[in-house]
């Protein structure tokens, strides 16, 4: 984990990111003969990712059918992996018990196994006791994963979960002469390193974080990122286990397809509608297949247009369904529509090319005909002239003709010149008028085309605005439903929060009561210890006093030789029992009196001995009772300490859960506010669209009036330039 943190810190660019493309490459389920802690982490990750894939590909796919109003019978694929995931990650699950065991210094792998069996064996269907087979590694428990049953060996799990760094090795690296190595460990703070004031708690808490906790935290972050993206899934299939080229192991491939959920995906694709397109996009892209199905010049709703277009095509009408906002296709139909569209485009382009080539060829042929006619006329005239050029009468005609009617010819020439001048002037005026009318006609036609384009654009804008309006209304309905759902979820979360708060208060009260009981027991224990110390002091004092009495008795025994043996036996008995005596105050007084009266008689000595033995037995019984009560109190204290630790652990878990619930509640409230703001924005946009639509309608009516006026002006100007207009119409027809 330390190495992963260092690598991430080195690769981090600290630049703002808004969009990203991520590639997640992970090994699949690992089922070996010997499976340890690493395999559990990898298989747990695969369980989460497989659940995400199943939810995204199967559950969300069928939920979209229901949301869009498609008639669909829900297919339960039976691939809910939540039971196995809860067994691993939930409180009192495998990882939770492993983290709890890492806190206790006397915990071992076997105590971890015992707790697993106590909590889950026979209570969870996914947790089983393995059968150890001779010749294979020992297994301590088995889990039923999505890909199969995996036997796990738990030896060394506690040490792996703690993942400690050796302090001595780290200190050696920090003092290394290699600059890179010393920089890597420069910021590492070990257990013996000085901690700044106010930061010690955070350092200590973070250093105790286990590998399983970090793995779960990173996995939760990964799943959050995946849920915020549009994922695409790629499955890798191993063809054979021998790595041989061109060899496919059919059972192995089918097993992988079944484990990966590919077979279920194929079932959904065959029965469902994997391809979908918005109505507007479908109408715009596939209208070319049958333009007559959607008439020009009138507004038709996108859904109705798509329905008319699909009903007019020669396809299987059971292969598609209409939703609220999209049209859904079965697998293969969209590819067929694409082929039909490509074929239609190919025919249209071929026809355009043929017409263009025909027009060019006809123009070239017309030029050839005109050239041929001109050449024939010129040749005929030249041949006729050459035939009469040398005829005598023609020569005479050429000589006499200029002399005849010369005066009349001159008058005619003058008249013709005047007429030519008038005609030329009239022609120039007519040409000028014609050019003026042509320019005016061209400008009017240009205005007409511009107005038609503008009207068409406004009609398209109006159609788009109506589509957007319908879409906004649908979005508003969906958002209102989401807001209602969020409100219900928020109420449920508030109720859960209130219940958790009540539980927390109850646990706090129990904890305070337990603390008071512990305080009382500690006070009682302190009192008992004080009494014990006082008793020991009394015993010591009595021992010293009895030593003095021994000296006195020794002096008296010289005078009482007859009683020496009995007296010495009594002293030996007292010396043997002096370590166990606690309270001998009464015995001391009686003993002093008996010592003073010892010279009296032997009977008094025997009486003293009997009293001492009775007091000794009483003190031994009291001492034994006191020791037993002390042991009971210590056991009670240890049990209360264990209960207190357990309650503290549960309280911390509840506090963390309450904080998560509060954070989720705040996020839901924030999202609710964002949705309300979005609804207000959509309502404002809807109002703006309505205003723009009214303006477009008004502009459309104004343009229609202007177009009618222009048409009237064109009709008025058409009387003077009817011939020119006909020519212009012919030109327009040719260009069209």
UniProtKB/Swiss-Prot annotation:
<dbReference type="GO" id="GO:0016460">
    <property type="term" value="C:myosin II complex"/>
</dbReference>
<dbReference type="InterPro" id="IPR027417">
    <property type="entry name" value="P-loop_NTPase"/>
</dbReference>
<dbReference type="GO" id="GO:0060048">
    <property type="term" value="P:cardiac muscle contraction"/>
</dbReference>
<keyword id="KW-0505">Motor protein</keyword>
<dbReference type="GO" id="GO:0005524">
    <property type="term" value="F:ATP binding"/>
</dbReference>
<feature type="coiled-coil region">
    <location>
        <begin position="403"/>
        <end position="736"/>
    </location>
</feature>
<keyword id="KW-0009">Actin-binding</keyword>
<dbReference type="Pfam" id="PF00063">
    <property type="entry name" value="Myosin_head"/>
</dbReference>
<dbReference type="GO" id="GO:0000146">
    <property type="term" value="F:microfilament motor activity"/>
</dbReference>
<keyword id="KW-0175">Coiled coil</keyword>
<dbReference type="InterPro" id="IPR036961">
    <property type="entry name" value="Kinesin_motor_dom_sf"/>
</dbReference>
<dbReference type="InterPro" id="IPR002928">
    <property type="entry name" value="Myosin_tail"/>
</dbReference>
<feature type="region of interest" description="Disordered">
    <location>
        <begin position="716"/>
        <end position="736"/>
    </location>
</feature>
<keyword id="KW-0112">Calmodulin-binding</keyword>
<dbReference type="GO" id="GO:0007512">
    <property type="term" value="P:adult heart development"/>
</dbReference>
<dbReference type="GO" id="GO:0030017">
    <property type="term" value="C:sarcomere"/>
</dbReference>
<keyword id="KW-0067">ATP-binding</keyword>
<dbReference type="GO" id="GO:0005516">
    <property type="term" value="F:calmodulin binding"/>
</dbReference>
<dbReference type="Pfam" id="PF01576">
    <property type="entry name" value="Myosin_tail_1"/>
</dbReference>
<comment type="function">
    <text>Myosins are actin-based motor molecules with ATPase activity essential for muscle contraction. Forms regular bipolar thick filaments that, together with actin thin filaments, constitute the fundamental contractile unit of skeletal and cardiac muscle.</text>
</comment>
<keyword id="KW-0597">Phosphoprotein</keyword>
<keyword id="KW-0514">Muscle protein</keyword>
<dbReference type="GO" id="GO:0032982">
    <property type="term" value="C:myosin filament"/>
</dbReference>
<feature type="domain" description="IQ">
    <location>
        <begin position="345"/>
        <end position="374"/>
    </location>
</feature>
<feature type="domain" description="Myosin motor">
    <location>
        <begin position="1"/>
        <end position="342"/>
    </location>
</feature>
<comment type="similarity">
    <text>Belongs to the TRAFAC class myosin-kinesin ATPase superfamily. Myosin family.</text>
</comment>
<comment type="subunit">
    <text>Muscle myosin is a hexameric protein that consists of 2 heavy chain subunits (MHC), 2 alkali light chain subunits (MLC) and 2 regulatory light chain subunits (MLC-2). Interacts with ECPAS. Interacts (via C-terminus) with LRRC39.</text>
</comment>
<keyword id="KW-0547">Nucleotide-binding</keyword>
<dbReference type="GO" id="GO:0045214">
    <property type="term" value="P:sarcomere organization"/>
</dbReference>
<dbReference type="GO" id="GO:0030049">
    <property type="term" value="P:muscle filament sliding"/>
</dbReference>
<feature type="compositionally biased region" description="Basic and acidic residues">
    <location>
        <begin position="727"/>
        <end position="736"/>
    </location>
</feature>
<keyword id="KW-0963">Cytoplasm</keyword>
<feature type="modified residue" description="Phosphoserine">
    <location>
        <position position="701"/>
    </location>
</feature>
<protein>
    <recommendedName>
        <fullName>Myosin-7</fullName>
    </recommendedName>
</protein>
<keyword id="KW-0787">Thick filament</keyword>
<dbReference type="InterPro" id="IPR001609">
    <property type="entry name" value="Myosin_head_motor_dom-like"/>
</dbReference>
<keyword id="KW-0518">Myosin</keyword>
<dbReference type="GO" id="GO:0051015">
    <property type="term" value="F:actin filament binding"/>
</dbReference>
<feature type="region of interest" description="Actin-binding">
    <location>
        <begin position="219"/>
        <end position="241"/>
    </location>
</feature>
<dbReference type="GO" id="GO:0030016">
    <property type="term" value="C:myofibril"/>
</dbReference>
